[in-house]
A protein has these predicted regions:
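Glycine- and acidic
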Residues: 16-19, 108-112, 127-132, 199-206, ...
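Intrinsically disordered or highly flexible coil/loop and linker segments, enriched in small
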Residues: 38-46, 71, 113-116, 132-140, ...
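Catalytic nucleotidyl-transfer cores of nucleotide-processing enzymes
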Residues: 139-261
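Long, basic N-terminal domains or extensions that often function
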Residues: 1-165, 174
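Short, glycine-/Ser/Thr-/acidic-enriched flexible segments
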Residues: 21, 53, 67-71, 77-80, ...
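Short alpha-helical scaffolding segments that buttress acidic/His motifs in well-ordered protein cores
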Residues: 148, 220, 244, 267, ...
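Divalent metal-dependent catalytic cores for phosphoryl transfer on phosphate-bearing substrates
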Residues: 258-259, 270-318
């Protein structure tokens, strides 16, 4: 009796009609929140304790308030409370609060800026102050900025430096090491040249900022020492595409060397088609130059630098 037929636009449709009684927001909220949390997808997730739950980081506390009332709910084994964990520099015991107004005040008093927009603005304000005091310009990478906003609770921007001798290494290598390995922001002089300074956005709260700076300088120095070693090793080695024979391109399609040979053949055929235009642009020896350019286009895949910093593929060869 619950199934019915109805003619819709000349087609007979079988359907079921039911009325679901509404429920209170307080009862619906736990279900909605749990579905939302479960729907989130990350590149990498983790498990913790003896649980089978997966999330980007362990869930340690849950605050769920509707109006002025605590919503009784449990997310991934953690029950909601009128309490939260403070910033690690403030201690490890939960901080209790009595109302939503007290909650926001208690957070900031315990080293946590809840709103991402406020954390972002704090970082940008401190970036501006660093630029004014140093006379240098910060390269504002929006993706990196979003990342440091997301991983800090009370961000503080600090300026550090490294030895000028590392500037002998190509700037692309230094910047890549800073941004990808350490989440640092590079600083440039007024002429757009990379300086031996960087900005770190720290989540540590300390009265001695020099201690934080020195620690980050030590880590970066080790990274740049490795990069300098790779760079000097590559300079001492022959830059040859013959080494590409040891790198597989795709199963059934040979090595990267085979791919390069095919590309050189294609380039020569295209050069014949556009011979007149290319001669006018590059002169009579353009075919030899074109062939050499294609031959060297993949050669940096064999370098230690590209092996360590894969994003520099194509850049190191140039």
């Amino acid at each position: 009796d619950e199934l019915k037929f109805e003619n819709i636009n000349g087609k007979e449709v079988l359907y079921h009609k039911s009325v679901i009684k509404g429920d209170s927001s307080k009862n619906l909220l736990p279900v909605i929140v749990e579905k939302f949390i479960s729907s989130l997808s990350f590149g990498k997730s983790m498990r913790w304790g003896g649980f089978s739950y997966e999330f980007i980081r362990p869930i340690r506390s849950v605050v769920a308030i509707l109006g002025s009332e605590l919503v009784d709910m449990e997310i991934y084994g953690v029950k909601s409370k009128m309490a939260f964990y403070p910033h690690r520099n403030y201690g490890y015991d939960m901080v209790e609060f009595g109302s939503i107004d007290e909650y926001f005040t208690a957070l900031e008093n315990n080293g946590i800026i809840l709103q991402a927009s406020k954390r972002r603005q704090k970082i940008l304000n401190e970036f501006k102050a660093i630029e004014q005091n140093s006379g240098l310009k910060i390269e504002l990478d929006e993706d990196l900025l979003d990342e440091v906003v997301a991983i800090t609770e009370m961000p503080t921007a600090l300026i550090g430096s490294f030895e000028e001798e590392f500037l002998e290494v190509p700037s692309e290598v230094i910047v890549t090491s800073m941004k990808e390995n350490q989440r640092y922001f590079p600083l440039y002089d007024q002429n757009g040249k990379l300086s031996n300074h960087f900005v770190v956005v720290s989540n540590a709260i300390s009265s001695d900022s020099n201690l934080i700076i020195k620690g980050n300088e030590k880590v970066l120095r080790a990274r740049l020492s490795d990069a300098k070693f790779f760079w000097e090793s590559d300079l001492a080695s022959e830059f040859s595409s013959a080494k590409l024979k040891n790198i597989t391109y795709l199963a059934g399609l040979g090595s990267m060397y085979d791919k390069e040979i095919r590309e050189r053949d294609i380039a020569r055929e295209l050069a014949k088609i556009y011979e007149k235009e290319l001669k006018y642009e590059f002169g009579g020896d353009f075919i030899d130059e074109l062939d050499r350019a294609v031959m060297l286009s993949k050669a940096d895949l064999t370098t230690a630098m590209v092996y360590e910093f894969t994003d520099l593929q194509g850049i190191m060869g140039s």
